């Protein structure tokens, strides 16, 4: 009997009509939608323009983006891995969260 009471309460809660918005609010949303449709379509932007603008803004703000970090890792002679570096590799830095930059260890003469 104890298990039945919470079940009935939840059942009545989910079956009761719930009004999230007043009726007048729906009409306002429909009007806004029709106004948005009348606007001109957005301009198609080249991907290179976006990447260039983001890169310039990021460098000005001092942020590093994944492709910049990957390039730095490769310049150091490393490669980005998932998880951890293997036993025969040396940790150089991080490419991103839980992605270390590793390079092969040099053989000791």
UniProtKB/Swiss-Prot annotation:
Basic and acidic residues: compositionally biased ranges: 34-44
A biological process from GO: defense response to bacterium
InterPro entries linked to this entry: Defensin_beta-like
Key words of the record: Antibiotic, Antimicrobial, Cleavage on pair of basic residues, Defensin, Disulfide bond, Secreted, Signal
Expression (tissue specificity): Highly expressed in kidney, and expressed at lower levels in testis.
Region: Disordered, residue numbers: 21-44
Propeptide: 21-70, 107-109
Main location: secreted
Secretion signal span: 1-20
Keyword Signal listed: yes
Function according to Swiss-Prot or TrEMBL: Has antimicrobial activity.
Similarity-based family: Belongs to the beta-defensin family.
Protein name as annotated: Defensin-B5
Organism field: Ornithorhynchus anatinus (Duckbill platypus)
